[in-house]
Swiss-Prot record:
Keywords: Cytoplasm, RNA-binding. The gene is smpB. One of its GO terms (molecular function) is RNA binding. The lineage of its organism: Bacteria, Pseudomonadati, Pseudomonadota, Betaproteobacteria, Nitrosomonadales. Required for rescue of stalled ribosomes mediated by trans-translation. Binds to transfer-messenger RNA (tmRNA), required for stable association of tmRNA with ribosomes. tmRNA and SmpB together mimic tRNA shape, replacing the anticodon stem-loop with SmpB. tmRNA is encoded by the ssrA gene; the 2 termini fold to resemble tRNA(Ala) and it encodes a 'tag peptide', a short internal open reading frame. During trans-translation Ala-aminoacylated tmRNA acts like a tRNA, entering the A-site of stalled ribosomes, displacing the stalled mRNA. This is SsrA-binding protein. It comes from Thiobacillus denitrificans (strain ATCC 25259 / T1). It is found in: Cytoplasm. It comes from the Bacteria. Residues 127-142 have a biased composition (Basic and acidic residues). Gene3D superfamilies: 2.40.280.10. One of its GO terms (biological process) is trans-translation. Belongs to the SmpB family.
């Protein structure tokens, strides 16, 4: 079940490969995510010192979060991946010109997971072509439906 989607990622990038990563979260963050108070729109993923981090993800704390700790809604959160996956990501992002983008946050066996995509940026003409293709697919569906009735 999806918690939050990053629809902008599919508009701005060609997604080549997907990885599922665990997140290192604090208690108030888990409660806020379960309440649906998370936004992936401005978020991105970086590799620093052999570890993968989610940066710019906004998790709004619940009003009941804490009285003595001031939660930081946009702190960097560590992602949990296998060493082989991290090495693969490092190789692709450094050599092949790929970037890492968060695609969606979901539950897997009761745990909160983040799906990240190995992506290549789209140029403006690619975005236009994709939009034209989507419109044509919609028009085709409309024609097929009208022909069946």
């Amino acid at each position: 079940m999806s918690i939050a989607d990053n629809k902008k990622a599919f508009h701005d990038y060609f997604i080549e490969e997907r990885f599922e990563a665990g997140l290192v979260l604090e208690g108030w963050e888990v409660k806020a995510i379960r309440a649906g108070r998370v936004q992936l729109k401005e978020a991105y993923v970086v590799v620093k010192n052999g570890a993968v981090y989610l940066i710019g993800c906004h998790i709004s704390p619940l009003p009941t979060a804490s009285t003595h700790i001031h939660p930081d809604p946009t702190r960097s959160r560590k992602l949990l991946l296998h060493a082989a996956e991290i090495n693969k990501l490092i190789g692709k992002t450094e050599r092949a010109g790929f970037t890492l983008v968060p695609l969606d946050m979901h539950y897997s066996k009761g745990r909160i997971k983040l799906e990240i995509g190995l992506a290549k940026g789209k140029k403006q003409h690619d975005k236009r072509a994709a939009e034209k293709d989507r419109e044509w697919q919609r028009e085709k569906q409309r024609l097929v439906r009208s022909a069946q009735h």
